[in-house]
Amino acid sequence: MPQFKHAVVITGSIGSGKSAVCELLRDRGFEIIDADKISHCVLDRCAAQVAEILGAQYVVQKDAQVANLNPHAEFSTSSGEEISSMPCVSVDRKKLGELVFKNPAELAKLEALLHPKITAEILSQAQALEAKEKLYFVDIPLFFESKRYEFFDKVAVVYAPKDTLIARVMKRNGLSYDAAKHRVELQIDIEQKRAMADFVIYNSGDLQNLRDETGSFLEKKLNML
């Protein structure tokens, strides 16, 4: 018996429409664990450690009382307590992303810090929802890539062809074809993900089509319970 028998992971590729599917599921009253939101919260809670490991330039202070401080000033990192004691600090995700995107060694350091905490929080929320004995969903964008969530054994892939993914990323992010193609190809190919899925939600049409596809998926899943 699976540990989380009422859970279904929602995943896909960049540009496939995972967020839209999750919104449609919320509209139908289903509870959803959002791995991205958890990751953002964990990242900010770990601001002190991020500064110690990668540099204080990746931490920003947002307290209104110090809003006029020199934005280029670096925080002291002689101890984590000094940064974590600030009224409101967070990680500059854009700057941090630029660092780890180009530097696998720094990315590995960040992942070693964050991933155990993220996984623990996802597990905690899943255990709470499992106790309700109702169907719920776990939105994990990089489910297949991460290989850290084998305790969830039912997976729905939101699918669109690769050319559609690239076009959407170009439009959404204002990228060139080559840049968008590169981002799409950083992830496991969408055709491989479709082959590994228990359920496929097709998203190549308009929003009404996606509503219909999501409804069909729910009907199949609910009939299996």
Model-derived features with residue positions:
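P-loop (Walker A) phosphate-binding loop of NTP-binding proteins
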Residues: S13
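Hydrophobic anchor at the beta1->P-loop junction of P-loop NTPases
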Residues: I10
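Walker A/P-loop
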Residues: S19
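ATP-binding Walker
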Residues: S16
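Small-molecule kinase domains that catalyze NTP-dependent phosphoryl transfer to phosphate-bearing small molecules
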Residues: E121-I122, L129, E150-F151, K171, ...
